[in-house]
Amino acid sequence: MALTAEQKKEILGQYGLHESDTGSPEAQVALLTKRISDLTEHLKQHKHDHHSRRGLLLLVGRRRRLLKYVAQVDVERYRSLIERLGLRR
């Protein structure tokens, strides 16, 4: 299910560089992480939903590319983001 406006605002408030920040890699990765976790829960219930599984794989790939970009630009921001999101890299 899609994120509501309130959920997006809360996530962007935590991870964005400022209140209305939607474009920074940190904000985008945080939103993707929430969508990935929601979709993962959906797929636990609906194991044969292959269309959503493909969407999940696309989201994971997009998040991986954004994280790779952040790691190349600023390693400290990358490490901080990984720790705050609880990702295991």
Swiss-Prot record:
It comes from the Bacteria. Pfam families: Ribosomal_S15. This is Small ribosomal subunit protein uS15. InterPro entries: Ribosomal_uS15, Ribosomal_uS15_bac-type, uS15_NS1_RNA-bd_sf. One of the primary rRNA binding proteins, it binds directly to 16S rRNA where it helps nucleate assembly of the platform of the 30S subunit by binding and bridging several RNA helices of the 16S rRNA. The keyword Ribosomal protein applies. The keyword RNA-binding applies. Belongs to the universal ribosomal protein uS15 family. GO terms for biological process: translation. One of its GO terms (cellular component) is cytosolic small ribosomal subunit. The lineage of its organism: Bacteria, Bacillati, Actinomycetota, Actinomycetes, Mycobacteriales. Keywords: Ribonucleoprotein, Ribosomal protein, RNA-binding, rRNA-binding. One of its GO terms (molecular function) is rRNA binding. PROSITE patterns: RIBOSOMAL_S15. Part of the 30S ribosomal subunit. Forms a bridge to the 50S subunit in the 70S ribosome, contacting the 23S rRNA. CDD domains: Ribosomal_S15p_S13e (cd00353).
